[in-house]
Amino acid sequence: MKLILSTLIVFIHTLLVSALPTKEGSDPNSAKKYLVSDLPGLHENITPDNSIPLMFAGQLEIYPETDTHYFFWKFSDSNPETVTNRTIFWLNGGPGCSSMDGALLETGPFRINSQQQVISNNGSWHRMGDIIYVDQPAGTGFSYSDTYITDLDQVAEYFLKFMEKYYELFPEEIGYEIYFAGESYAGQYIPYIADAILQRNKKLVDGEHKYDLRGVLIGNGWVSPNEQSLSYLPFFKDHGLIDVHHPKWATLLAKHEQCQKIVNKIDSTFDDGVVHYYEVSSSTCEAILTDLLEYTQDTASEKDQRCVNMYDYTLRDSYPSCGMNWPYELVNVGPFLRQEKVMHQLNLINLKKWNECNGRVGRTFQARHSIPAVHLLPELAKEIPVMLFNGANDIICNSQGVLSYLQKLQWNGETGFTNKDNQISWIYDNKEVGYIIWERNISFINIYNSSHMVPYDLPDVSRALIDLITGKYDEKDVDGKKSFVTYPLGSRKESDASANGEENAGSDKVPGDSPSQTMDPMISSSTASSSSVESSLSSSTASADSDSTSSKFTRLIQLAVILVIFWGVYVLYASYKSRPSSIIKKPTNNTSNVTRSSAGKKKNVQWADQLNQFEDDERTQEPNQGIIAKAIGKITGSKDTRGRYAPVQRGNGNEYIDDIELGEGLSDPNVDEFIIGSDDDEEQGQAHSGAATHNQKQKPMN
C-alpha cells in the first residue's frame, strides 16, 4: 500500500508540472527550467491572480569558452485578451548598470516596497508585449564572465549571440515583431544592436530566421556626448539656475567655448568614417556640468537641499551627490535582489551579489574604437522608426541636447527637422502630456513633468509610447492644434464605441506628410497595409485565446483525473483497513514486534534540494487529516516553512562593494549602497566612459 501511495505522489507531481502554463509552442524541456513561480509578496500583493505575469528568468550561457552568461528576466501578460506577438528588449545603461532598474523601478510589472516585497506597477509595459530585461555587458547585474568587453561593436556581437540562445529556448517567438527600448547610455547600445540585426537580416544563411525588428525607443539617450554637453550652460540659464551676473559665469563660458571647438572639429570630419580621439573622448565637455553643479550650490539651504538634482532640475539633493541619492525607492531594490531565496527563485546558477552598477565593467568599457551611436541613426531611419523620447526635467541628457544633434544630422534626404516648430500635441487620457516632432522616420518626443527616468515618473504615459510607435493612436484637432491621442489600456475601444460610427473611429491612424499616405513610417518600412497589420494582430490574438482555452480545458481534465485517482486509492485503502486481519495475513506471535519495528522506521522524502523526514504511513494520524490532505501536504510541502531550496555557500564569504547607478551617500551610515566600486575591489571616484563626473564621483548613465 505504501508503494502505491509513493507512486501516486510521484505521478501526481508529474501531472502538475506538465500542466504548468507555457507560451504557445515553447519547448517545455528547455524553457521550463527558467520558469519563475514565486517571489516575496507575489501572491499576497498582486491581485487578482490574472494580474500575475508569466515569468522566466536565469543566467543564459552564451559563450562557454569564457563562461559568459547573460541574466534575463522575461515578463508576459497572463491575460489572453491582451496577448500580442511582440517582443520588447529593455536595456539600461551605465555602462555597467543593471537593467533591473528598468524591471523594478520603471517599465516592469513590479515595484519593490520597504519590506522587500513586490507590489504592482499599473503602468507596466508587459501589457503591450513580452518584455525582456537583460543585464549586459557581462559583469553587469547578475550577468558574469571570465572576461569583459571594451567596445560597442562587441556589445552588438554579444547581444546577437544572446538572442540566438534566447530563441533556442523560445523558438515560437522567433517570428514576433521586435522592439528595443532603453535609456541613457543605452542610447549607445541600442543603435549598435539594431544596426547589427539589420545587417544580419541581409545575409542570412540556410536555417537562419530573420529577426523582425520594427523600431527602437531611446529615452533620454546619451547618443552624441560632446554635442549634448554643449546644452548644459544654456539649460541652466534658461531654467533660472544661473545668470550672466554669476561670479563664475566667465569661467563657465570659457569651458563652454573649449567644448564648442571640439564639436566644430567633430562636425568637420563627421562623415569620414574614421574614429577620432577627440570624438570618443568627452571629458572636457562633460566637465561643464561638473562645474555648474558646484558653482550653483545653495549653501544657505539644508544640507540635503543644496545641489540641483542632475536627473530632475526641480528636485534638490546634497552636494556632491546632486541627484545620486535618487530615485528614493532604489534603496529597496538592492536588498530585494540580494535575498538568497529571490536568487533561487530567479534560477541563478552563480549566486553573485547584485550591484546596480559594476565599476570594473565601466572602467573596462571605454568604447575608444567605436564611433558614437549618432552616426548610425541615418541608416537605421532608412529601415525602421527611431523614437527619441525625453523627460523635460532632465539635465544630464536633456531635450535641448537631443534636438541640437538632430538638427545637424542628415537622414532620408534632408538635414534635421525641416520645421522643428511644427509640434504635434500628445494627448493621453484627455491631458496634454508632451509634444512630438516627427519627420522621415525619426521622432522626438518631449514629455512634461518627467525626469531622466520617464517611466519611473509617468508609468502609464510611458507605456503609451508603444501605442505611438505601433500606430495605435488617433489623430485629432484638439483646441486648434494637431494632436496624437492615446488612451489608457482598453479605453480606446470604449471611446470608439461611444463615437457611434464617427469617421475613422477605431482604426489605426496613419499620419504622414500628406493625407494620401497609406503607410505609417512609425510602424515599419514594409509596404504592408495597416489593415493587414490589424488582421495579423487579430489573428494572433484569436490564436492565443484558442490556445489558452485549450490549455485551461486540459488542466481541468488533469485535475479531474487526479481527484478520481485520489478517490479510488482512498476507497481501496479504506477497504484494506476494514478487512479482518486473518484475511490479510496469518497471525503470528511476533506480529506486534514486526509492527513496532515498522512503525519505528523513518523514510526520506526528497523535495527540491532539501531532505525532510516523515513518519511512516502507519503512524497514528491527526483526527481531522484524511489521506487526501496528507498527500497534498506532501506534494505542496505546506507544512515546511523553510522554503524549497537548501542554503548555498557563498564561497569564501567575501562581500562585494556596491555600485549604485543613481546615488551615493545614503542617510544610514551603516548601509552605504552608493559607493562606486566593482566585483573585485572597493573603488571610489572612477569616471566611466560616457558619464560626467563631479568631485571624483561618477554620474552614471542608467
Curated annotation (Swiss-Prot):
Annotated active site residues, numbered on this chain, are S184, D394, H452
One of the GO biological process terms: apoptotic process
Coiled coil stretches, renumbered: none
The family database entries (SUPFAM superfamilies) matched by this protein are listed as: alpha/beta-Hydrolases (SSF53474)
Task: State where the protein is found.
Answer: Golgi apparatus, trans-Golgi network membrane
How is this protein situated with respect to the membrane? Answer: Single-pass type I membrane protein
Residues on Cytoplasmic side? 577-702
Catalytic reactions of this protein = Preferential release of a C-terminal arginine or lysine residue
Query: What are the protein's UniProt keywords?
Result: Apoptosis, Carboxypeptidase, Glycoprotein, Golgi apparatus, Hydrolase, Membrane, Protease, Signal, Transmembrane, Transmembrane helix
Q: Which residues lie on this side of the membrane: Lumenal?
A: 20-555
**Bias kind Polar residues: ranges:** 587-598, 692-702
Q: Where are the transmembrane segments?
A: 556-576
The cross-references to InterPro entries, in alphabetical order and at most eight, read: AB_hydrolase_fold, Peptidase_S10, Ser_caboxypep_his_AS
Provide the residue span(s) of the region labelled Disordered. Answer: 491-531, 582-603, 659-702
Gene Ontology CC annotation, any one: membrane
Q: What does this protein do?
A: Protease with a carboxypeptidase B-like function involved in the C-terminal processing of the lysine and arginine residues from protein precursors. Promotes cell fusion and is involved in the programmed cell death.
The UniProt entry's sequence similarity note says: Belongs to the peptidase S10 family.
Q: What is this protein called?
A: Pheromone-processing carboxypeptidase KEX1
Organism of origin: Candida albicans (strain WO-1) (Yeast)
Give me the gene this protein comes from. Answer: KEX1
